[in-house]
Amino acid sequence: MKKKIIIIAGEPNSINSEIIAKSWKKINNNLKNRIIIIGNYELIKSQFKILQISIQLHKIEKINDLASKKKLNILDIPLRFKNPFKIIDKDIRKYLFLCFECAHKISKQKI
């Protein structure tokens, strides 16, 4: 099996979700099933809705969960928010730390 490609969703108040969506639409289907986004599922879903982007999402709890071949796979990291583009700095720092910590653990596992 080919190695997975892990991408951190990044700063919630930025344009990262838009970049992820545009890139997702341009890559081929063979590559899509290897990509996993580390971020908050509800946040990305809300941002896509506001930006009027229609990409199907698949929430996964663990890196070894079966990834969907045609949906954007999101490894869910907890984050509380009311407005998906106006999140408090304190919550952002904690969220980004958890995302990087998760990515670091995955890289140590060599998945």
Predicted regions and their residues:
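Contiguous, glycine/small-aliphatic-enriched amphipathic segments in soluble metabolic enzymes
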Residues: 1-111
